[in-house]
Amino acid sequence: MDKVTLKKNLQEKMDKALKVLDHELKGLRTGRASVNLLDSVTVEAYGDRMPLSQVASLTTPDARTINVQVWDKSMVSSVEKAITVANLGLTPSSDGQLIRLPIPALTEERRKELAKLAHKYGEDTKISLRNIRRDGNEELKKMEKDNIIAKDEHHSLAEQVQKLTDEYSSKVDSAIKQKEQEIMTV
């Protein structure tokens, strides 16, 4: 592996770690309605388990409601059951075709729990970034040992790897700070 490939590889891995964090943060319920809350819901449909988004259209008509328009009327009850079983704290109400999910206001205690969880996701992502950095530094040592790069070049590249790690770590911090503000806003 050459140094350009190594840097590109590290950057791709760090981007993936950030995408995972972003996905986890989107799943955290804030005071606002978001169709991302239902990403984890799977429905028993046609003899298989399918994501809710493949059997219904999801919309947010206002900040406190999610509407689930089920395409096949015979599946409305199984969609309601799947939402209830998902344990999201949402109570579906249906008129036979459209399912409405009112989003209850978050209590102060629940907001703090969610902020803590967001912080934990951030820490887990930082651990992933540090592991990626460690792997990169080990690869640099191997490259130096195999005489692919010189010792001074090894130190220069190690500094670049650290700089890259710091850059991504600050992106994690800002994402967590933004999510915590979003959660704590009443």
Swiss-Prot record:
Its GO CC terms are: cytosol
Does the entry feature the keyword Nucleotidyltransferase, yes or no?
no
Q: Quick check: keyword Protein biosynthesis in the entry?
A: yes
Q: What biological processes does GO assign it?
A: cytoplasmic translational termination
**Where in or outside the cell?**
Cytoplasm
List the SUPFAM superfamilies hit by this protein, alphabetically. Answer: Ribosome recycling factor, RRF
InterPro entries from the entry? Ribosome_recyc_fac, Ribosome_recyc_fac_dom, RRF_sf
Q: Which UniProt keywords apply?
A: Cytoplasm, Protein biosynthesis
Predominant location of this chain?
Answer: cytoplasm
A Pfam family per the record: RRF
Instruction: Extract the GO molecular function terms from the UniProt entry.
Output: ribosomal large subunit binding
Signal peptide bounds: none
Which family, according to the similarity comment? Belongs to the RRF family.
List the HAMAP family.
RRF
The task this protein performs is described as: Responsible for the release of ribosomes from messenger RNA at the termination of protein biosynthesis. May increase the efficiency of translation by recycling ribosomes from one round of translation to another.
Protein's recorded name:
Ribosome-recycling factor
* Natural source organism: Rickettsia bellii (strain OSU 85-389)
Q: What is the lineage of its organism?
A: Bacteria, Pseudomonadati, Pseudomonadota, Alphaproteobacteria, Rickettsiales
